[in-house]
């Protein structure tokens, strides 16, 4: 009488097939994880740039106190969260441009404050060599890699 169950060869073949399928799926999992981080990077850059532009518009329309020679861009990212006083308002209400500074999803150290995970470009620095300065004209990621589209992350 034949015993019921799997033979050793059937188990080995099954394990081998599962191993091949798993190894074929791993690159797809990594690719999807990278795609998700890149999507988050796009969204974070858009949020920050929109807040910087809103601050600049408020400054240009006379709602933000500026000194002679100021560019009208925020002095740092934290100002966008902390807010500035609307000098045209009789009640001196505060204007806020961000709820919080988003983290750079490509930044490797989770212990660093979110505002410090971004590279800052001042209004006076050229696009080819972004440098921090008296204001924040633009932000960029400090990641060195290239995206799935072949463009360096720093150029996004």
Give residue spans per PLM region.
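Preference for short coil/turn "hinge" residues that link or interrupt alpha-helices
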Residues: 19, 26, 34, 91-94, ...
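N-terminal single-pass transmembrane signal-anchor helix
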Residues: 2-29
């Amino acid at each position: 009488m034949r015993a019921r169950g799997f033979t050793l060869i059937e188990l080995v073949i099954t394990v081998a097939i599962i191993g091949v399928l798993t190894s074929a799926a791993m690159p797809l999992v990594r690719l999807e994880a990278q795609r998700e981080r890149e999507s988050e990077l796009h969204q974070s850059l858009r949020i920050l740039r929109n807040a910087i532009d809103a601050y600049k518009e408020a400054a240009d329309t006379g709602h933000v106190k500026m000194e002679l020679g100021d560019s009208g861009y925020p002095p740092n990212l934290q100002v966008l969260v902390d807010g500035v006083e609307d000098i045209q308002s009789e009640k001196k209400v505060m204007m806020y441009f961000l709820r919080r500074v988003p983290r750079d999803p490509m930044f490797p150290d989770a212990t660093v404050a979110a505002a410090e995970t971004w590279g800052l470009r001042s209004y006076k620095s050229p696009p080819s060599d972004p440098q921090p300065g008296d204001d924040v004209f633009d932000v960029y990621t400090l990641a060195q890699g290239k995206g799935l589209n072949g463009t360096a992350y720093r150029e996004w």
